[in-house]
Amino acid sequence: MSKIDKPLDSWREELTEEQFHICRLGGTERAFSGEYHATKTPGVYHCTCCGTALFDSDAKYDSGSGWPSYFQPVDGEAVRELDDFSHGMHRIEVRCGRCDAHLGHVFPDGPRPTGLRYCINSASLKLVPREG
């Protein structure tokens, strides 16, 4: 997968204010406020910045957290995980594997088969519904 590296000013021109704040500055939307937290439409969730496929609706579940939650990404290259020591705690940040957009965090309290909960901001996603 070819990487995308753009200056912040380019991203600022292409994204909404909320998308820029979350994806490029590492922000977080309020729980239960995002477009996709309760969506059950079958399809694939892509990065809002670069269009890379990130999560399939087959891996989406209701974690009760108020953010879209998935037990796995579409493949091992779709996302990358980084240590995050902000806010006085240790978490694992999830970023787009192609453009490095901040997506959310992953926690070890998810369902089978992975036991993981990818807790993702709706503003970092674009749902492409499955046809048929």
From Swiss-Prot:
Could you say which residues bind Zn(2+) here? Answer: 47, 50, 96, 99
**Cofactor(s) for this UniProt protein:** Zn(2+)
GO function terms (MF aspect) = peptide-methionine (R)-S-oxide reductase activity; zinc ion binding
What broad class of enzyme is this?
Answer: oxidoreductase
Q: Which Pfam families match?
A: SelR
Q: Look up the EC number in the record and give it.
A: 1.8.4.12
Q: Which InterPro entries match?
A: Met_Sox_Rdtase_MsrB, Met_Sox_Rdtase_MsrB_dom, Mss4-like_sf
GO cellular component terms, alphabetically, are:
cytoplasm
User: What does the record give as the reaction this protein catalyses?
Assistant: L-methionyl-[protein] + [thioredoxin]-disulfide + H2O = L-methionyl-(R)-S-oxide-[protein] + [thioredoxin]-dithiol
Catalytic positions? 119
The UniProt keywords, alphabetically, are:
Metal-binding, Oxidoreductase, Zinc
> How are cofactors bound according to the entry's free-text note?
Binds 1 zinc ion per subunit. The zinc ion is important for the structural integrity of the protein.
Instruction: Please indicate which superkingdom the organism of origin belongs to.
Output: Bacteria
One GO biological process term is: response to oxidative stress
Enumerate the spans annotated as MsrB domain: 8-130
Under Gene3D superfamilies, the record lists: Peptide methionine sulfoxide reductase
Q: Which HAMAP family match?
A: MsrB
Checking NCBIfam families in the record gives: peptide-methionine (R)-S-oxide reductase MsrB (TIGR00357)
To which protein family does this belong?
Belongs to the MsrB Met sulfoxide reductase family.
Name of the featured protein: Peptide methionine sulfoxide reductase MsrB
